[in-house]
Amino acid sequence: MGGIVYAYELGRQLGKRAIFTERVDNVMTLKRFSIKPGERCIIAEDVVTTGISSLETKRVIEEAGGVCLGIACVVDRTKADAPSPIPIVASAAKLDLPNYLPEECPICAEGKLPLVHLGSRKMKEQAKQTL
């Protein structure tokens, strides 16, 4: 959901409509909108780390008959050795931040905050567990 405001403004600046996918039973879905066959689409994301959510969105676009041109994001956190599976055509910032395994995480070692997996799919559940 973090990319919706960015997508809206990107669409406004480009003179194009902005739509979004959402999860239904943990499956990315185009619930409120439609894509015309051959319609060219750019995936707008706030942060791209692994590109998994973008891949799910690309699948939805292609199943609807659209063409995915790439990703525009605010922050590109992809790694050189694990680039996004979809080309990132524009980003405001490229950040090379470390990812840690739980046993290697310095913050975890200090007992301040437990390490959780990448992404935000289960963020609400994880936040409840740490409180």
Identify the role of each PLM range:
Residues 1:
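Phosphate/diphosphate ligand-binding glycine-rich loop within oxidoreductases
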Residues 4-42, 50-55:
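Short, glycine/charge-rich flexible loops or terminal/linker lids adjacent to PRPP-binding catalytic cores
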Residues 58-131:
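PRPP-dependent phosphoribosyltransferase catalytic core
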